């Protein structure tokens, strides 16, 4: 097993799925930067992490080092230094397309961008991305912090 180059994860959306991703990433010792326009998102995510932590501990799924959780004011701030971006906004096509457009404008051009979409075509989400080949579907099973995810690579892609 090799060490991952991913140290900092940006999460766009802090609802059930985003909070679950935050918990999973923190349990694996990653730095997490989360953005969500809803004022209650911060408390929601912090509560989710606190509630899930004993479950992860009992299951032996915590790394030696707990990651750090930070909150950003907007997408640009959240993704600017991220090594991986996971989008978790509501399942509305135009919203997701717009969010992916903004992410692609501010994330490094070598960063993979995943969407938690459960039913939208990746090719549609790529429509306005600066680097459409970076986008993939990374849809989690519930609870996100315990179960593996379904990954779907979209077209076109480019090797890294």
Regions inferred by a protein language model and the residue ranges of each:
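NAD(P)+-binding Rossmann beta1-loop-alpha1 motif at the extreme N-terminus of oxidoreductases
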Residues: 1-55
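Structural motif
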Residues: 12, 72, 88, 115-117, ...
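Short glycine/serine/threonine-rich phosphate/pyrophosphate-binding segments
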Residues: 18-21, 94, 118-122
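Acidic/polar active-site rim loop that often engages polyanionic ligands
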Residues: 28-30, 143-151
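Hydrophobic/aromatic beta-strand patches that form the interior of the parallel beta-sheet core
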Residues: 33, 86, 136-138
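Rossmann-like NAD(P)-binding element
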Residues: 37-44, 54-112
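Rossmann-fold NAD(P)-binding glycine/threonine-rich loop
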Residues: 98-146
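Single conserved hydrophobic/aromatic residue that forms the stacking wall/gate
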Residues: 151-160
């Amino acid at each position: 097993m090799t060490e991952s180059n991913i140290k900092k994860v940006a999460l766009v959306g802090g609802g059930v799925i985003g909070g679950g991703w935050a918990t999973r990433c923190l349990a694996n010792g990653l730095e997490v930067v989360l953005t969500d326009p809803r004022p209650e998102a911060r408390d929601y995510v912090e509560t989710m992490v606190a509630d899930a932590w004993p479950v992860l501990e009992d299951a032996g799924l915590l790394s030696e080092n707990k990651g750090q959780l930070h909150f950003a004011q907007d997408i640009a701030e959240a993704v600017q230094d991220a090594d991986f971006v996971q989008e978790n906004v509501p399942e509305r096509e135009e919203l997701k397309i717009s969010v992916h457009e903004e992410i692609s404008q501010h994330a490094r051009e070598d960063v993979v961008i995943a969407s938690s979409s459960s039913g939208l075509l990746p090719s549609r989400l790529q429509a306005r991305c600066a680097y459409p080949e970076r986008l993939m579907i990374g849809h989690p099973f519930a609870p996100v912090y315990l179960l593996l995810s379904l990954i779907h690579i979209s077209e076109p892609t480019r090797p890294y």
